[in-house]
Amino acid sequence: MSSQPKLRILCLHGYRQCDQSFRQKTGSTRKLVKALADFEFVNGIHSVAVDEHSETSRAWWFSNADQMSFSSREPTDVSVGFDESVNAVVKFIEDNGPFDGLLGFSQGASMVHLLIAKAQLGEIKLPGIRFAIFFSGFLSLSSKHDTLTSLRIKDFPSMHVFGDSDEIVARPKSEKLADQFDMEPIRIAHEGGHLVPSMSKHKERITQFLREQMAPIASA
């Protein structure tokens, strides 16, 4: 008897993180749903040069071209390195896919949203990807992304997890991102701050969400 197929989820880390550090930070969540999903991690291609640990400190794009830094709070007219990161993620998916879903934290969550929007506009292809999970997500404040951030995301299941004590990405910003999805998003609030929380209190909800996404692969 063959084992039940698992979902494959591609994970995008936050600003000044990397694939390996994000793997560690998501350990408890991955363990919680290990029977349902396998997780793979992609590394941002841009080093945060001002950080002494630049090899393990990465970004998807920069909002300040002079300092080559990023802020989720300040509007900007630039998105340095964004297009290169889009191409890198698309190439990673082509080389290592297929994947069923995307998961992102903070800037990585914003990147996930922008990738989905670009796919829905037909600008890129994300073969097989049909759902997303966001931790501390937010809408990009770069005017370069206005077409993407104003787009209503259609027919795309999503789960949004945010902290009531998050001082970097306040809950209303994550709620605003969730509002862009026309298919009623799953929203989970936790008491913590800017982190990927233990999801043990919400095991039933995340398990149910993932099981719903498994239907296409179970019938394949």
Curated annotation (Swiss-Prot):
Please verify whether the record's keywords include DNA damage: no
* Family recorded in the similarity comment: Belongs to the LovG family.
Annotated keywords: Hydrolase
Pfam families noted in UniProt = FSH1
What is the protein name stated in its UniProt record?
A: Esterase CBG03338
- This protein's superkingdom? Eukaryota
Q: Which SUPFAM superfamilies match?
A: alpha/beta-Hydrolases
What residues make up the catalytic site? 106 (charge relay system), 166 (charge relay system), 194 (charge relay system)
Kindly list the GO molecular function terms attached to this UniProt entry. Answer: hydrolase activity
Taxonomy of origin reads: Eukaryota, Metazoa, Ecdysozoa, Nematoda, Chromadorea
Keyword flag Cytoplasm: no
Q: EC no.?
A: 3.1.2.-
GO CC terms in record: cytoplasm; nucleus
